[in-house]
Amino acid sequence: MTIKRFFVCAGIMGCLSLNPAMAEWTGDARDGMFSGVVITQFHTGQIDNKPYFCIEGKQSAGSSISACSMKNSSVWGASFSTLYNQALYFYTTGQPVRIYYKPGVWTYPPFVKALTSNALVGLSTCTTSTECFGPDRKKNS
């Protein structure tokens, strides 16, 4: 390998390692988490020729959260089928879960007004209202 090729390859590798487009992970954010939630509502539909589903969940204290997933939309769209199957299972069984969501993703006004702007980004099982498996999204103090 010539010196020129070496520096070209090293430069390319250096640029790739500095790329800010890192993997999106459910545990990255510091907000958007409700624990000990029972999914009480389930809705499916289609928008812009893409299927979507939405859930609403309630905590025992009465707080509620809604979130939606849309196939092949947003960075979380690739998880649509997995999230759909898990959400439907948890809705059917009534098992308490932790709902991870990203606020403000959906922006179409009629959709947001009727459902939510929150994107569903993950689900975890819970053994109590506060003890759940998976990342714990705590806001920075």
Swiss-Prot record:
Signal peptide location: 1-23
Keywords from the UniProt entry: Host cytoplasm, Host endoplasmic reticulum, Plasmid, Secreted, Signal, Virulence
The keyword Iron-sulfur appears for this protein: no
Hydrophobic patch important for binding to SubA: region residues: 89-94
Deletion consequences: No longer toxic to CHO cells when deletion construct is coexpressed with subA.
GO MF annotation, one: sialic acid binding
Cellular component GO terms held in the UniProt record: extracellular region; host cell cytosol; host cell endoplasmic reticulum lumen
Predominant location category: secreted
Tagged with keyword Secreted: yes
Induction of the gene: Part of the subA-subB operon.
Effect of S35A: Reduced toxicity of SubAB5 for Vero cells over 99%, no longer binds to Vero cells, decreased binding to human colon sections
Residues holding N-glycoloyl-alpha-neuraminate: M33, F34, S35, Q59, Y101
Extra facts: The E.coli strain this operon was isolated from causes hemolytic uremic syndrome (HUS) and also encodes a Shigella-type toxin Stx.
Primary role: Receptor-binding subunit of subtilase cytotoxin SubAB5. Required for receptor-binding and thus correct trafficking in the host cell. Has specificity for host glycans terminating in the sialic acid N-glycolyl-alpha-neuraminic acid (Neu5Gc); each subunit in the SubB pentamer binds one Neu5Gc. The protease subunit (SubA) cleaves host BiP/HSPA5, inducing the host endoplasmic reticulum stress response and eventual cell death.
Domain comment quoted from the record: A patch of hydrophobic and neutral of amino acids (residues 89-94) forms a ring around the central pore of the pentamer, which interacts with the A2 helix of the SubA subunit; some mutations in this patch prevent SubAB5 complex formation but still allow some targeting to the host endoplasmic reticulum lumen. One residue in this patch, Thr-92, is the only residue that contacts SubA from all 5 of the SubB subunits.
Name listed for the protein in its UniProt record: Subtilase cytotoxin subunit B
Organism: Escherichia coli
Gene assigned in the entry: subB
